[in-house]
Amino acid sequence: MKKTWLPFLLLPLLVSATIFSAQAPYDTAQGFEGLNIGAGLAIGLAAIGAGVAVGMAAAAGIGVLTERRDMFGTILIFVAIGEGIAVYGILFAVLMLFGKF
């Protein structure tokens, strides 16, 4: 995807966030409006990063496994480390949403 599409993809998010924050019928705490977007970005970007990391580690791991079968445990650990990025994203989102600031 070309980088010229990025502003067109982010524009609806920013417009809808502005509209929804303007239509809030209740009082929100100072600075709370951005937490929902921040939590969503934390999960989404962490999932993208984990997908890239797991994809690269798994592709390299399959190449290693064709030559050395005894490296399976090591490769599995490297793939699991890449998946930990998504777990950290979920953890940060939960802390943002339910943490006391």
Swiss-Prot record:
It is found in: Cell membrane. The keyword Cell inner membrane does not apply. Its main location: membrane. It is a multi-pass membrane protein. The gene is atpK. The N-terminus is blocked. The keyword Chloroplast does not apply. Has multiple subunits with at least A(3), B(3), C, D, E, F, H, I and proteolipid K(x). Keywords: ATP-binding, Cell membrane, Hydrogen ion transport, Hydrolase, Ion transport, Lipid-binding, Membrane, Nucleotide-binding, Transmembrane, Transmembrane helix, Transport. GO terms for cellular component: plasma membrane; proton-transporting V-type ATPase, V0 domain. Belongs to the V-ATPase proteolipid subunit family. One of its GO terms (molecular function) is lipid binding. Coiled coil: none annotated. The chain crosses the membrane at residues 5-25, 37-57, 75-95. It comes from the Archaea. Component of the A-type ATP synthase that produces ATP from ADP in the presence of a proton gradient across the membrane. This is A-type ATP synthase subunit K.
